[in-house]
Amino acid sequence: MEKDVIKQKVKERYGRLGLSGGSDCCSSDCCSGDSPDKAAANAGYDVQDLKSVPQESIIGAGCGAPVGFANLQKGETVVDLGSGAGIDVFLSAKSVGGAGQVIGIDMTDEMLEKARKNARDNGYSNVEFRKGDIEARIPVDDNSVDAVISNCVINLTTNKTDAFKEMRRILKSGGRMVISDLVADRKASSIDLERWSSCIDGALAKDDYLASIRMAGFKDARVLEEREFMKGELIGGRKITSIIVKAVK
């Protein structure tokens, strides 16, 4: 299937999600009809953390809570890939403080508009949202970032290694990548556009996922957390698992 067709389908789906505010996402909890805040809590977010961010930024589209594993420090620069309405950007902004900076990257205009409004309405001065394609070119300078985070986004890309190479490019030496994503027990036997844009068919087998990270030049790629997705049901004939992965430049 053509990569551009897949990318357009993903943009359309997440554009709708940006407009609807949380009823058309790939999270298992959204599929079950749970509210965005409950879906986020079920994905691993701390309930008190959820209360500390703009409620409009919680759309329940994640499959984990990477900020809690990133060990962010005051004054650091952080980039969130596929930042959506901004939940992880705003959580990171609290961790890095006024001397730090958090940049959210998204390819959908609707999500960017929503995130920027959330930032304006809630007085965030250390965040910025930029439009970009994370496989082609992340709009961030080389060697300028302390940490890259992402939540249930890399599975949506058509070339994972290119996305990981872009992450490595923008990270400083010794910088870390901490991402939450979905992986499978084996490669997809066929591709369905709806399932891909729902974070399923683009999910790699776990070993292939880690190999893509290493192929991009990262060191010490390891799984920090692994949890059942959709209660272990087979999706598209595969068992899907949510993982949080860390690697270092």
What residue ranges belong to the model's regions?
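Conserved SAM/SAH-binding beta-strand->alpha-helix loop
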Residues: 108-110
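Conserved alpha-helix/loop element of class I SAM-dependent methyltransferases that forms part
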Residues: 34-77, 88-91, 95
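Short alpha-helix
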Residues: 202-217
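Conserved SAM-binding strand-loop segment of SAM-dependent methyltransferases
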Residues: 123-136
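Conserved SAM-binding loop
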Residues: 115-116
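Short, glycine-/aromatic-enriched active-site segment of Class I SAM-dependent methyltransferases
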Residues: 183-201
